[in-house]
Amino acid sequence: MFITFEGIDGSGKSTQIKLLARYLEKRGKRVILKREPGGTETGEKIRKLLLKEEMTPKAELFLFLASRNLLVMEIKRYLSEGYVVLLDRYTDSSVAYQGFGRNLGKEIVEKLNDFATDSLVPDLTFYIDVDVETALNRKGELNRFEKREFLERVREGYLVLAKEHPERIVVLDGKRSIEEIHRDVVREVERRWKLDV
């Protein structure tokens, strides 16, 4: 089982992924929790570079793809060993952030992601949707990925992806309480995989 969580910073996705990991572990599942960019030793170095350096949108995209390619090799291994892999961001982030936010184009970013991941698609993606104002209020400070207009384009990208892939992407209202969102996450996971309770 390969599950990803998506959303703009301040949406609550990192909280929800940790809650789901705890829930699954209590039910005897072996869980691996990873994040993007990062998730591997080299990926974490790339993450530091991405978060502190100004660069062109294309250079940024290629660094994300390099990090993702390394991580996918690990994810495939964990999946083959029967682990549940939970990932904080994946290909949908690149499409939303670089394709829409940085205006590189949805199609080219999707093709490059497909190549970098050997076409590995999550079984399920939770997109936690919040308006930009709410997300910025939760975060408090802005980094270069968080300018208001940019985040509006990113959010639009996520919503486009959710409409295109309703069988995979479940949209959750991120303005609700942590507990309410967690209940919906658990309900969807149980619906799809009939977990032993």
UniProtKB/Swiss-Prot annotation:
Keywords: ATP-binding, Kinase, Nucleotide biosynthesis, Nucleotide-binding, Transferase. InterPro entries: P-loop_NTPase (IPR027417), Thymidylate_kin-like_dom (IPR039430), Thymidylate_kin_CS (IPR018095), Thymidylate_kinase (IPR018094). Pfam families: Thymidylate_kin (PF02223). GO terms for biological process: dTDP biosynthetic process; dTTP biosynthetic process; dUDP biosynthetic process. It is an enzyme of class 2 (transferase). The keyword Iron does not apply. Its EC number is 2.7.4.9. One of its GO terms (cellular component) is cytosol. ATP binds at G7, I8, D9, G10, S11, G12, K13, S14. Gene3D superfamilies: P-loop containing nucleotide triphosphate hydrolases. It comes from the Bacteria. It catalyses: dTMP + ATP = dTDP + ADP. GO terms for molecular function: ATP binding; dTMP kinase activity. Phosphorylation of dTMP to form dTDP in both de novo and salvage pathways of dTTP synthesis. Belongs to the thymidylate kinase family. This is Thymidylate kinase.
